[in-house]
A protein has these predicted regions:
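C-terminal functional extensions of proteins
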Residues: 116-174
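N-terminal, charge-rich interaction modules
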Residues: 1-63
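Cofactor-cradling patches in redox/metallo enzymes
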Residues: 39-47, 51-119, 126-135
Length: 174
């Protein structure tokens, strides 16, 4: 039988680990298109993702736990992206940055992957072409909140509709 003291220690330890993961995200940007300019703007001093624990990008996926997929992914890049994802440290999170990464954008053709969630699990989607820096920071804060709670918000295996995505990232009124 588990005592209340043991449960308290486990719960407190889980909360501490969640807090540490929330504020120490090691990011790896996989930048392929024009959203890369907006990603650089978010990383620079005016918006500064370092204030939110997602500091300087790492030079190898083995050192990172947050993958930013920024821009269009074509079928030739798909194996490289999947390999980068496999090399990342666990637990890992993925953000689809912009309309092209989330759904293929306006590149509806034979060469473009229609959303990176067809290849790897995606935890958060940032809409826009390109997305505003405020939207990127809002997404990062919401992902950190979910990391602190110990859950991944959206996984690729789930049946997620466009309405679910809109509801997920709609502004909170309460």
């Amino acid at each position: 039988m588990i005592s209340q003291d043991e449960t308290y220690v486990t719960t407190t330890l889980d909360a501490a680990i969640g807090w540490c993961r929330k504020w120490s995200l090691f990011s790896y940007p996989f930048v392929t298109a024009c959203c890369g300019m907006e990603f650089m703007a978010v990383s620079c001093s005016h918006y500064d993702t370092d204030r939110f624990g997602a500091a300087l990008p790492r030079f190898t996926p083995r050192q990172s736990d947050l993958l930013w997929v920024v821009g269009t992914i074509n079928h030739k890049q798909a194996p490289v992206l999947m390999r980068v994802y496999e090399q990342m440290a666990d637990p890992k999170w993925v953000i689809a940055f912009g309309a092209c990464a989330a759904s293929g954008g306006f590149y509806d053709n034979y060469a473009t992957v229609q959303g990176v969630d067809k290849l790897i699990p995606v935890d958060a989607y940032i809409p826009g072409c390109p997305p505003r820096p405020e939207t990127v920071l809002d997404c990062l804060i919401k992902l950190q909140r979910d990391i602190h709670r110990g859950k991944n918000p959206i996984l690729a295996g789930d049946d997620v509709t466009h309405t679910d995505l809109l509801a997920r990232w709609a502004p909170r009124t309460s």
